[in-house]
Amino acid sequence: MLKQVEIFTDGSCLGNPGPGGYGAILRYRGHEKTFSEGYSLTTNNRMELMAAIVALEALKEHCEVTLSTDSQYVRQGITQWIHNWKKRGWKTAEKKPVKNVDLWKRLDAALGQHQIKWEWVKGHAGHPENERCDELARAAAMNPTQEDVGYQAEA
């Protein structure tokens, strides 16, 4: 039987683009591990993706995961859009390159053999874990220590 793990995520950006951060909580049998990191120049969507990626990459074996995010971009991207992006060679329906392709590929790889249930939660609506992740993300954004090397400014 697979281990049942809960993951909660959030990303934040002070300006978009601007300094950003992510926060994630990984919970298994009442034990929690938190993750957060700040980047000097990034976007909110990149930080939402990073939160999910880092938490999933921390799993050491195949798990049954419930991942809660307040990002429709992440949830819809991974459950609906990614299949066609991959078929089209990482291009959108308009034949444009997929934004944040470096992170979408990394998230796709991080899913591995996990069984994942994606749940959307309304942000800033009192969901305790989402609020904690938001606090982690905002604190990280205020003290960025990393460069988001994959971030590309709009032309």
Curated annotation (Swiss-Prot):
Its EC number is 3.1.26.4. It is an enzyme of class 3 (hydrolase). GO terms for cellular component: cytoplasm. Mg(2+) 1 binds at residues 10, 48, 70. One of its GO terms (molecular function) is nucleic acid binding. Residues 1-142 form the RNase H type-1 domain. Its main location: cytoplasm. Mg(2+) 2 binds at residues 10, 134. Binds 1 Mg(2+) ion per subunit. May bind a second metal ion at a regulatory site, or after substrate binding. InterPro entries: RNase_H, RNaseH-like_sf, RNaseH_domain, RNaseH_sf, RNaseHI. Keywords: Cytoplasm, Endonuclease, Hydrolase, Magnesium, Metal-binding, Nuclease. HAMAP family: RNase_H. Endonuclease that specifically degrades the RNA of RNA-DNA hybrids. This is Ribonuclease H. The gene is rnhA.
